């Protein structure tokens, strides 16, 4: 009789624990820009359709999102290999995409963070110009740019070539200064125009600046007819995105190791750029773009996923 009671108690305890796991709310965090809002919406809707309870918080700066995840306030964040390598772990060694991923996976595991498989898209920095202007000047790469600028500055000393960028890149130790030194670019203080990253694209489109710092998966590059210059000396690090999950959450949900693979496998540069364009150019909401992406790839069986908590 006692053995039967003990068995029943153990069974009830198991059911109670399972119920707690099912009732757990997964906290998804995202950063300030369009791409992050889309990725968090995709993740939230994908998880909700599979019976998980989620909340979403977007609009976080990179360091704030990282700190929130390390302290246990966020469970899932889409992170970039370059951000973890350079900003969080202070590694300035030049690594290729695969080596970058292996290094951050190892380093962040010590912080209680688990990197899932990386996507194929690389949202790194790049320099861009209006396509027509770049074609006229014969500029395909950053080295071409350096050559043309040197020729023009020699022919017309004191000439300006306005360069638009966000304030962070202008001041960060792996930003404007080291890049200019590597390529032999010479910009004066009067050449530099600091502005919100989103305004750089409009300034380029309207020919208000000669050159701009952009992100390679931004949807406005194609629509605004901007040429991304080849980083032929490989200055910019790789920024491949991947879901990063707290280790405690992974221990409770080992299925997460492969659950997101259908999403990860479908995200490349062209796909991410097209998704971003639907928000930035077509003015669709990140939630709608996410739902359409999931439906297109048959990752929602009836298209009735929730919209992913508070934005």
From Swiss-Prot:
Q: Which GO terms describe its cellular component?
A: ATP-binding cassette (ABC) transporter complex; periplasmic space
Q: Which residues form the signal peptide?
A: 1-23
Q: Name one Pfam family in it.
A: OpuAC
Keywords carried by this UniProt record? Periplasm, Signal, Transport
Q: Name one GO molecular function term.
A: carnitine transmembrane transporter activity
The UniProt family comment states:
Belongs to the OsmX family.
**Main function:** Binds glycine-betaine.
Q: What's the protein here called?
A: Glycine-betaine-binding protein
Provide the species name: Pseudomonas aeruginosa (strain ATCC 15692 / DSM 22644 / CIP 104116 / JCM 14847 / LMG 12228 / 1C / PRS 101 / PAO1)
